[in-house]
Amino acid sequence: HQAAIKYVKTPIGQTDFRMSTLFADVGDPGAIQIVNQAQQAYVAAYIKANLPQYAALPVLSVSAPFKSGFQGGADYTDVAVGPLAINNAADLYLYPNTVYAVKVNGADIKNWLEAAAKRFNQIDPAKTTEQQLISTFPGYNFDMFTTADVQYEIDVTQPVGSRIKNLTYLGKPIDVAQEFVIATNNYRATSGKSFIDKLDGSGTIWASPDANRDVVIDYIRKNPAVSRTTNGAAKSWRFAKATVAGPVVFTSGANALSVAQAAGLANVSLVAADDGSGKGTSKYSVDLSK
């Protein structure tokens, strides 16, 4: 037991920012980007060494906020500034998944993101009463890119399936026919048919033996100086601007507005320090016009 405790406390790096999913639902990539970076680097290196037939395809990665408050205010990934140990990587990657690579095209990427955007309720701009931003669709299904190479907007005033706007790759509208390799996990690659058909296993080009968590640990060991600039600031998506008559609200960890501010989310405000749920959460609002 002591050996196990010692192992999980093994230092692997250092972070200069608080890596959390507290505001992942409104655009903070702080705990997701390093997972995507690790998955992308791992898959790209394998393809280069072993799969020459895919060497010309861009390799991208998606991941999701696995802990996003379902069980209350403490149910978020939240890694403090300072030393990073193996147990922190387990917080950054909760599940015992393995890395899988799938081949898709630009049209598939849009449809994949449309499915992920079920995370949000449809917001009525004319409604003057409070509207809840987050739906019952689980946070662990809210796949996102976290790279400057891919940019898109999510229009929450639109119905499910029509929310992804201005999707670009390298600054140009994504080519629906262009092929890409996406690094993800075995669960999404084989059980994700509700996202796109190719996520029934048929799109998989490499089923790696390695756990996503171990890939993250290895990546941090190789790149131990983790920083907001390099590992926590690449916002691929934002909400499409919308003027809403009433407040658009969501819950997150108690009194954590400083985390949103540190992530540059100037459109988030604290509405109530105690949202009355008894779960240790606060109520926040997001101004979609900003």
What annotation goes with each model-predicted range?
Residues H1-K290:
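Catalytic centers of hydrolytic enzymes
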